[in-house]
Amino acid sequence: MKQHLIVEVFRSSKHDGMYLYVEKSKGLKEIPEELMTRFGKGISAMTMLLTNESKLARATPENVTKGIREKGFYLQLPPAKDEYLLDLYKTPTEAVY
């Protein structure tokens, strides 16, 4: 079964890599206030026709469609930071010889 949905993708003004997918016709009107407080001002990143064949960077079209149909939105969180990479930028606290 083919499903088509016109979605608007907003990026967060507070968190890099956080995106909110919503149905274009509804926009951000029905997003819970608590989520919008944490998300910040939604900055429109793109509008797209979402189908089961769509290619998305860090989500599947099925999950995005399901989230929008059930909750009115799909929240894509930033990727987890690799702890090893974070350690490269820490100031050493003990001498290593």
UniProtKB/Swiss-Prot annotation:
YcgL domain spans which residues? 5-89
Q: Which domain of life is it from?
A: Bacteria
Write down the SUPFAM superfamilies for this protein, in alphabetical order: YcgL-like
- Residue spans making up a coiled coil are none
What PROSITE patterns does UniProt report for this protein, alphabetically?
A: YCGL (PS51648)
PANTHER family for this protein: PROTEIN YCGL
Query: What protein am I looking at?
Result: YcgL domain-containing protein Mmwyl1_2530
Q: Which organism is it from?
A: Marinomonas sp. (strain MWYL1)
